[in-house]
Regions:
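Nucleic-acid substrate recognition interfaces
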Residues: 1-290
C-alpha cells in the first residue's frame, strides 16, 4: 500500500499488533491496474494485487500487522460454481506426529514450525528482554527506545513467518481435499478440552486443527461438498475397522492396532480414519432417513 501524497492510516489501539478498519463500498471503491480507490482518499493507492478480483466489491478491510505491513482485504459477492462430482469420499484422522492420516492411505506430516523456530525465537526474545531492561534502567519509554523497537520487529518477523507458513500449509491441504472428494468425514474434536493437557497443549496449538476444519467447512459450503463431523467420543482409534471389536485397553504408545478378535494388524491412525469414514457415512444415511 503506497502513496506519497498522504500518510498511512492511524489506528486507535496501539497495543494490538494487528490493527484494522473496514469500510463499505458505496460506489467509491474500485481497482484500476495496480491501484485501488478508497473512500475519503483523493488519490489512488498503489497496491500489489495477489489475485484477480471477481464479483461485486462489497467492502474492504485495511489492516496493519506487527511489522508495519499494510494489507487490503476485499470482500466480494459472486456466484460460485459447484465442483464436479468425484464419487470419492474420505475419512480424516487428525494427529500431532502426522497432521492428518486419511482413509485412502495418505499421511500428511506435521510441519512442526514451533520446534523449527524455537531456538531462534528464544534467542531473539532474550535479546528483547535485555533491551527492555536497558530502556527501563535508562528511564526511557519503550516506544522511544530505538534498540527495543528494532528488536521487537525481529521477534515479530519470526512469528509472522511461522503464521504465514502455517496458513499456506492449511490452505493448500484443505483445497486439495475439497477438490478431490465429495464427502469428507472428520472428528468433532474437543480442542479446548485437549488444550488443558499441558504436555500436549503446545503441540496442539502448533498444528492448527481448528483453522484446518474451518477452511474445510467454508470451502465445502462454497463448492457443494459435504462435511460430516463424527461425535467427539466415538472410539475411532479403539474400534477394529475389520470386525468392529472395541479394544478398551489401547494406549497412546501403541502405534499398531492389533485386534484380539480377528487378528487384524494395522496402523493405528489409518485404522481410525477408516472408522471415521464409516461412521460419517452412517450419520449421513441416518440424516437422509429422518
Amino acid at each position: 500500500l503506497k502513496n506519497k501524497d498522504f500518510g498511512f492510516p492511524k489506528y486507535k489501539c496501539k497495543s494490538n499488533p494487528v490493527q484494522s478498519y473496514t469500510t463499505n463500498n458505496q460506489n467509491t471503491i474500485y481497482i484500476k491496474d495496480s491501484y485501488i480507490k478508497l473512500p475519503k482518499l483523493k488519490s489512488l493507492v498503489k497496491i500489489k494485487l495477489h489475485k484477480k478480483i471477481k464479483g461485486i466489491i462489497k467492502s474492504v478491510t485495511i489492516s496493519k500487522n506487527s511489522l508495519d505491513h499494510y494489507f487490503v482485504s476485499i470482500l466480494c459477492e459472486e456466484e460460485i460454481e459447484e465442483l464436479p462430482k468425484t464419487n470419492k469420499n474420505i475419512g480424516i484422522d487428525l494427529g500431532i506426529k502426522e497432521f492428518a492420516t486419511m482413509s485412502d492411505c495418505t499421511k500428511v506430516e506435521n510441519l512442526k514450525l514451533s520446534k523449527e523456530y524455537e531456538k531462534k525465537l528464544k534467542r531473539e526474545q532474550r535479546k528483547l528482554s535485555r533491551r527492555c531492561k536497558l530502556a527501563k534502567d535508562s528511564d526511557k519509554k519503550l516506544s522511544d527506545s530505538k534498540n527495543y523497537q528494532k528488536q521487537k520487529k525481529k521477534v515479530a518477523k519470526i512469528h509472522n513467518k511461522i503464521r504465514n507458513k502455517r496458513k499456506d500449509f492449511v490452505n493448500k491441504l484443505s483445497t486439495k481435499i475439497i477438490n478431490n472428494h465429495d464427502i469428507i468425514c472428520i472428528e468433532d474434536l474437543n480442542i479446548k478440552g485437549m488444550l488443558k493437557n499441558h504436555k500436549l497443549a503446545k503441540s496442539i496449538s502448533d498444528v492448527s486443527w481448528s483453522e484446518f476444519v474451518r477452511q474445510l467447512e467454508y470451502k465445502a459450503n462454497w463448492y457443494g461438498r459435504k462435511i460430516i463431523k463424527v461425535p467427539t467420543f466415538y472410539p475411532s482409534s479403539k474400534t477394529c475397522s475389520s470386525c468392529g471389536n472395541i479394544k478398551e485397553t489401547l494406549t497412546l504408545s501403541e502405534r499398531i492396532y492389533h485386534c484380539e478378535c480377528c487378528g487384524l494388524e494395522i496402523d493405528r491412525d489409518y485404522n481410525a480414519s477408516i472408522n471415521i469414514l464409516r461412521k460419517g457415512l452412517e450419520i449421513l444415511r441416518e440424516e437422509k432417513v429422518s
